Structure formats: C-alpha cells, structure tokens
C-alpha cells in the first residue's frame, strides 16, 4: 500500500479508548524506568494501529517540493542538453511525469475522501495532488514539434502563467529563433529576463523593445508592410467601434482610409498613422493631391498635347469658377475634369490605369457633408494612436523597424502595451500589430518563402487582443513556420471578446497543445477537462441489509461491489486545486503531462 494511501487500521473510537487505557501504564513506566517507558510507547503506537514509517512518509509528501531555480545565463547550456536528449526533446518544462490511468484512479480515491488545502506552505492548492509521484519526477522534455501547432495556456491570476511563458520565450531565444512577444501588461520582469537571456546567448543586438510609455523604446511602424492601400484601410477599419450609427458608415470609412493611403503612395510619402491622420482630416486634400500628381506626371511626359489639354481644362475651370461659398458644389465638376484628363491620357497611352489615383478621385467626388459623417469615427481612432509619445514611436520621421524586418533578420521583438493604464490605446495597437503579422504571413505564404528560423509569437493576456487577424494567424500561419502561444485566465474572457462561445471555440480549436495551471473558474476547468482523454475508474459500493422475519427471525446481509465507469483522466475538481506553478499539459498526440515549473531568476538574483 502506498504511503499516500495509508489509512489507520483501527477505528478512531477504538484507538481513542485504547489510548486512554494505556495512559496509566505509561505514567507508571515513566516513574520506574526509561527503557520501560520507551518500550511501552512503541507498543502503544502498534496497538493503536499507527504505522510510524508510512505516517512520516505521508507527512513528508504533504510538503510541496522546492521549485527548481534557473538563471538566465544557464539557458544556453540547458537548451544544448535538451536538443541532445534521446527522443529529440528540446523544450524543458521543469520536473514531472506522464499522467496515466493509474494516477487518475488514485486521484479519484483522494477526491472521494476529500482533498485538504496546503495553504500553510504558501503554494495554494492541495497536498494530495502534489504528493502523487512526487519522488518519481523526471525532467520534462517536450518535443519542439508539439509547439508548432500553436498552444493555449489557461490559469487564474498568480498561478504561474507568466512564469511558463517566460520559460518558453527564453528557450526560444536561446535556440536562435525569431521571437515576437506582445505583452499587454508590460511586465518588467519578463522584459528583463528576455534581455538577460539574449545577452547570455550572444543575441543582445537582436533585441528590439517597444514600450507605449516610451521607456527605452525603438521606433516601430506597424503599417509599413502592405501590398496595396486597401490592405491598410482594412486593418484600420477593424479597429472601428462595432454597432451603433458608426456601423452603417463602416464601409465608407474604410474607403476613406484606403484613399488616404493611396494619396500618400502617389505623393511618395511614408505610410504612417500620423500621415494618414493628416490626410483624412481635410477632404480637400484628395482633389488637390490628385491634381498635383497629374500635373507632375504631365511635366515628366514632356508632351505638348498633354500640356495643351491640361491648359484647356484649367481654362474651363477659370471660366466656370464658383464663388467662394459654393466650393462644395463645385467639387464634383472639378473631379469630373480630372477624370476627363485621366481618360484622355490613358486613351493616348500616356498614362496607365492607376488604382491609387482612382481611389483618390472617388473620395474627392464624395459630398463634403457626407464625408464628415463617414470619417467621424476614424478621426478619434487615429488621434489616440498619434498622441503624445506614440507620435514619435509609431510615426517618427526617422528610420523605424517593422515586423518584416524582425522576421527577415531573425530578431527578438518585445512590446509592452500597458493596457492596465490605457486599455483603449494598448488594445488598438496590439490589434494593429496582429494585422501586420497576418499580412507578413500572407505575403510569405503567397511567395512560397518559409523563414529558415521558426517565428515564435507569444501573447500574454490574449483575450485583450482577440480579433479576426488573430484567428487568421491561428488558421493559416503554421504553413510559413509561425507558432503562436496564447495565455489567458478564463474561457469566459475569450467568449466575451469574441462575442460568443463559438468564436472562443474557434480559437481553441486551432491550438494543438493545451497547458492548464490552477483554474479557479468552474467553466474553464470543465472546458479543459472536456479536451482531455478519458479512462476507466472503479467505484466501490457496500450495503448492509436487515430483515426481521417471524418464522426465520432476524436476518442480515452485507454486499460489496466494484464497477467501472468512464471518468476524465484529470477531473475539473482537481484542476481547481492545483498548487501554484504546477500544471498539466495535453500534447497533440493525446499524452498528458503533469509538471512543476522552475523559477527563472535574473543575473542579479542568487539561484
């Protein structure tokens, strides 16, 4: 019988009576001889049914084992050892074991007896869960291919989600992969550990940091990667408010954003958030910009007929010039003349069809009053992303980085969004970044270019950044060697952000590997249990019957039975009682691991 299953043999009442009867004898022995006292004490324990070695072993198992401590400087050597391990395991998850059916049956017995908390040890959870296979734990080495199919991490606040993310991120840095970390919280410890690991691996120069509060940040342009203007317009339109009066104008707002980007392309100006805001603020920019571009184009052609045609159009404009108060009414005829000029140039093969010019002319032809309604929701959006220090970080005049640069050069990128301080700005910027990543993945996929180094994308508090682009990355980015790891507290967070249970299940359905730390939320624990394998557990039952018969007298009977029933390999009730830093992990092949995370210390801390 295992020590963790040892029960006192004698009934509690009998043990108590026997102990009371032995007290006078112990007192008499203590008064005459110490040897007799010790002998009597041992006999008393044996008679009371207390098996001392198992009892001591049981008490020792109730104490949570100390967590392993790693320093950032040790990760390069750890990664090398993991890569050389038998079986090709190259991701270290701490100490643990493969959870099997026998563990599930033992856990069911603990659940039937009732689990006791271990809060006195400061780790939360319950001691029985920790005691299972405590002395048979081995280093957990997860095959790297298991993380390629995307991963999801569930765990309530303070259970170790960030510790697990930190361990996965720092090992990816040590393996030399491209690493992108989007941190809505702005955890300074996480940023410090990434920097220390990068330096320890000789990759200190590869690290780029973007902090929306401007703390030691490098300029970054989340709009620099695109194939056409409509792509940028669609990205920004996804950030617009949903529902209400703005919903009816959303398609027109996207047209205005696209036309603004088209005008910047025609003028050769950088496409940044600030430049788009500058264009979209004034409807007149579209007409004046298109006219200036056509004049410059005709000047480059050095064609006398084209110059004469432009002069005649300008002459007609002068003859039919409207009063100052009728500027809005004269906009349509002015755009019509520009369209006429474009048609004449195309007819004489002096100008090729230009989609960007058509976008600008279409927006210039829009009624001014209607344009104000269309752009009413876009202006506040762009304004928040161009405010204060964000203007220099995201739209600065100097050189800036982009995700195309990060992926192409195999660098390390960390961004702190500080959603706790400004949730609106942080969430919008995070969604813009996910849209840029989806665009990069789409271009690589279309070109058939798979990055040599895997692109690891880690998103903490993923529910803050849920969007259509995140779903697209999960659905399709694996084909270009992208691997996403998402972390969140509860399943309800995903349901709320996606607008329904189906949307949340769509995200989880794309994650092959599932990590779960302690889940205080019952619905989350049940959801994790639903995605785990099942096994057969025995249920014992007993019955005592008494029957009084006039002829046969009193009859009695005792029956015991054991039947098997299907039960989860790790039940939701136990998942809600896991100690801190302990986790279960369901792999893509169906195996279930249970482990204890190590603590990743900094260079300034002692291990």
Q: Where are the predicted features?
A:
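Hydrophobic alpha-helical membrane-insertion segments
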Residues: 32, 42, 192, 469-470, ...
